[in-house]
């Protein structure tokens, strides 16, 4: 008889995550992500490849990845994608996915209201705690189609670091956050990118 695999959970205590105090030089491993591209005038230009995408199915793993990238000094070069049932849905169905109602989707004003609250008051704030630096996404640009709603956030600010420190280590980056839901089920898609500028 073989033992079944245990589901691994990632321990993450948001109250014990340390704040990123100072920037450091770009990691040497980033050199492998630079490629040469021919420009319009025929000369070769060095370009940074987009960060590889990591996929997650639970919020704790997603947040742990963001925390780990910060402490691996890769906070400005990562791409994470999360597909999950938001906590307010799981709470309503008592963690039994079989009890999910067909009306729990983007067409329900209650679902939309709860999702917007979750994004603003929980998701973004928890991501900020995990990454250890300031996030200022501001107001989202909302795009709605008959099949889905997408909220797009962008932060091109200084992330709480002095300009001199960013210039010294050449650590300028922008953050993009895209949250979407559809008209078929309550699954939410979160796409987070940190891209050097």
Swiss-Prot record:
Topology of the protein relative to the lipid bilayer: Peripheral membrane protein
Keyword list, A-Z: Cell membrane, Membrane
Subcellular location, record wording: Cell membrane
Coiled-coil annotated residue ranges, if any: none
Gene3D superfamilies xref list: Respiratory growth induced protein 1 (3.40.1000.40)
Region (Disordered): 22-50
GO terms, biological process: energy reserve metabolic process
Classification via InterPro entries: RGI1, RGI1_sf
Function: Involved in the control of energetic metabolism and significantly contribute to cell fitness, especially under respiratory growth conditions.
Protein family according to the UniProt entry: Belongs to the RGI1 family.
Annotated protein name in UniProt: Respiratory growth induced protein 1
Name of the gene this protein is made from: RGI1
């Amino acid at each position: 008889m073989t033992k079944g695999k245990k589901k691994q959970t990632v321990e993450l205590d948001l109250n014990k995550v340390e704040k990123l105090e100072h920037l450091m030089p770009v990691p040497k491993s980033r050199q492998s992500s630079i490629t040469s591209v021919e420009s319009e005038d025929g000369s070769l230009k060095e370009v940074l490849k987009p960060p590889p995408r990591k996929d997650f199915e639970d919020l704790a793993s997603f947040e742990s990845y963001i925390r780990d990238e910060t402490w691996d000094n890769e906070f400005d070069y990562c791409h994470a994608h999360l597909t999950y049932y938001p906590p307010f849905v799981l709470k309503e169905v008592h963690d039994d996915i079989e009890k999910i109602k067909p009306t729990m989707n983007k067409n329900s004003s209650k679902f939309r209201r709860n999702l917007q609250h979750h994004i603003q008051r929980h998701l973004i704030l928890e991501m900020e705690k995990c990454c250890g630096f300031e996030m200022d996404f501001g107001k989202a640009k909302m795009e709605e189609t008959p099949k889905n709603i997408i909220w797009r956030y962008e932060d091109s600010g200084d992330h709480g670091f002095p300009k001199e420190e960013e210039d010294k280590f050449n650590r300028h980056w922008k953050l993009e956050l895209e949250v979407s839901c559809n008209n078929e089920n309550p699954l939410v898609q979160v796409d987070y990118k940190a891209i050097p500028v």
